[in-house]
């Protein structure tokens, strides 16, 4: 069963590229035609590239890898946060901090600081022994850390792959991933450089519907990979991994919504399985 249909791609406006004067000649092979000064992307190619990216993400997660979702432009922020959270993956949908990958040891220390401040707040000691001014500064520090690092707060190591919406805007993230040899999976609009992406998906990276659809497809691949990982561990008799934040992995627990949705897509009734 196809992970996405041509009809869905058309409805999402995935085929609309940029104006013909704003393009990267390297994208010529992915362009079907031109209409009213706008390049039209070849969705037949998009379908095959989606399948390739889907399989890569699924296999990466099945082997224990993590996928970092990145998209800080307004059109991508909600989809990135929602879909990454749905499958327990880290995400960045605010400003990308330079060194988030290449200097992760320092970023990790900031994550520990965020958790420290959260613990102080929970214990009621964030304001307890501090002056009003000090308490205000600590509160602002916590809010800033939450805003910039909240999506990766549970990330303890570098991701096995990154999903990126708009490689031109997120060029620093792309550069850092390439420098570290982390595979880049991304939407390729007609103004992008395909040489920078390992698993490209030719498509519209500006329209909310297009971005939401393609990000959902990648999240579905993650979900299927997580299910394969859990099944493999159960077969091997190995202990279950640490739970994904906010998600229980115990065999006796009810299926999460994304698991039920995935089974439904495959024509399986979760209730008949007794889960």
Swiss-Prot record:
Keywords: Ribonucleoprotein, Ribosomal protein. One of its GO terms (biological process) is translation. It comes from Acidothermus cellulolyticus (strain ATCC 43068 / DSM 8971 / 11B). CDD domains: RPS2. One of its GO terms (cellular component) is cytosolic small ribosomal subunit. This is Small ribosomal subunit protein uS2. HAMAP family: Ribosomal_uS2_B. GO terms for molecular function: structural constituent of ribosome. The gene is rpsB.
């Amino acid at each position: 069963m196809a992970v996405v249909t041509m009809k869905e791609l058309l409805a999402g406006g995935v085929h609309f590229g940029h104006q013909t004067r704003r393009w990267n000649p390297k994208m010529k092979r992915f362009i079907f035609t031109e209409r009213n000064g706008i390049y039209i992307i070849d969705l037949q190619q998009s379908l095959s590239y989606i399948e390739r990216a889907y399989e890569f993400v699924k296999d990466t997660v099945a082997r224990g890898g993590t996928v970092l979702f990145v998209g800080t432009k307004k059109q991508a922020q909600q989809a990135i946060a929602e879909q990454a959270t749905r499958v327990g993956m880290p995400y960045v949908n605010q400003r990308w901090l330079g060194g988030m990958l290449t200097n992760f040891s320092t970023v990790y220390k900031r994550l520990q600081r965020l958790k420290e401040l959260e613990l102080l707040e929970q214990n009621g000691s964030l304001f307890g022994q501090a002056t009003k001014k000090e308490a205000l500064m600590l509160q602002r520090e916590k809010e800033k850390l939450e805003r910039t690092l909240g999506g990766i707060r549970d990330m303890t190591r570098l991701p096995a792959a990154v999903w990126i919406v708009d490689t031109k805007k997120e060029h620093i993230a792309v550069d850092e991933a390439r420098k570290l040899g982390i595979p880049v999976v991304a939407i390729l609009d007609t103004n992008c450089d395909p040489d920078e992406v390992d698993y490209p998906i030719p498509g519209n990276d500006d329209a909310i519907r297009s971005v939401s659809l393609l990000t959902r497809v990648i999240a579905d691949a993650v979900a299927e990979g997580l299910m394969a990982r859990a099944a493999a561990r159960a077969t091997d008799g190995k202990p279950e991994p640490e739970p994904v934040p906010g998600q229980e992995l115990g065999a006796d627990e009810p299926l999460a919504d994304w698991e039920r949705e995935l089974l439904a897509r495959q024509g399986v009734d979760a209730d008949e399985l007794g889960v």
